[in-house]
């Protein structure tokens, strides 16, 4: 069952993937192994496909390092729940096919290590007997996810979903 990895407010792209581990520094095939190297050194070894990241306010602020969310995607992260997002980080998540949900209530309710199920289409998150309703992703994003990401969709169809 997917687990929650909970972080605090103001987690920036350098926290997610420190610059010294950028693809051009350590190699395109290894950079994701350093996700959260300074905050949670065990993260890259222990995260499993489908696990969910939970952030507080202003998730992903800082420089526009697309390789930070790319590292998360390579590790199997499919969704993030935050109180709020930095705009560029939010857009990079959408482009890469990681679903960004936003909910103060759910962030406050979840704890690090919780086991949860998340239906990406409906936005329903289940923890034991509890159910939380997140705003479901827009139809264009769900369509893009069928191909892997918004970028993958564009490469295959030569247009964006809904055009």
UniProtKB/Swiss-Prot annotation:
pH-activity note: Optimum pH is 8.0.
The organism's place on the tree of life at top rank: Bacteria
Enzyme class: lyase
Catalytic activity: (2R,3S)-homoisocitrate = cis-homoaconitate + H2O
Signal peptide residue numbers: none
Transmembrane segments: none
Pathway assignment: Amino-acid biosynthesis; L-lysine biosynthesis via AAA pathway; L-alpha-aminoadipate from 2-oxoglutarate: step 3/5
GO molecular function, one term: 3-isopropylmalate dehydratase activity
Entry keyword annotation includes Zinc: no
InterPro entries, A to Z: Aconitase/3IPM_dehydase_swvl, AconitaseA/IPMdHydase_ssu_swvl, IPMI_Swivel, LeuD, LeuD_type2/HacB/DmdB
Keywords tagged on the record: Amino-acid biosynthesis, Lyase, Lysine biosynthesis
Entry function: Catalyzes the reversible hydration of cis-homoaconitate ((Z)-but-1-ene-1,2,4-tricarboxylate) to homoisocitrate ((1R,2S)-1-hydroxybutane-1,2,4-tricarboxylate). Can catalyze neither the dehydration of (R)-homocitrate ((2R)-2-hydroxybutane-1,2,4-tricarboxylate) into cis-homoaconitate in vitro, nor the reverse reaction. Is not active toward (S)-homocitrate, cis-aconitate or citrate as substrate.
Record HAMAP family: LeuD_type2 (MF_01032)
Subunit description: Heterodimer of HacA and HacB.
Name this polypeptide is given: Homoaconitase small subunit
Lineage, broadest ranks: Bacteria, Thermotogati, Deinococcota, Deinococci, Thermales
Gene name of the encoded protein: hacB
């Amino acid at each position: 069952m997917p687990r929650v990895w909970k972080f605090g407010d103001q987690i920036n792209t350098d926290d997610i993937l420190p610059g010294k581990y950028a693809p051009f520094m350590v190699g395109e095939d290894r950079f994701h192994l350093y996700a959260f190297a300074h905050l949670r050194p065990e993260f890259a070894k222990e995260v499993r496909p489908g696990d969910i990241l939970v952030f507080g306010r202003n998730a992903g602020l800082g420089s526009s390092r697309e390789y930070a969310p790319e590292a998360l995607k390579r590790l199997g992260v499919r969704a993030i729940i935050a109180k709020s997002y930095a705009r560029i980080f939010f857009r990079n998540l959408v482009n890469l096919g990681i679903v960004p949900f936003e909910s103060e209530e759910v962030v406050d309710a979840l704890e690090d290590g919780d086991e949860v199920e998340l239906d990406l289409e409906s936005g329903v998150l289940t923890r034991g007997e509890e159910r939380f309703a997140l705003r479901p992703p827009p139809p264009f994003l769900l369509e893009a996810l069928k191909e892997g990401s918004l970028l993958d969709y564009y490469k295959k169809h030569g247009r964006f979903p809904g055009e």
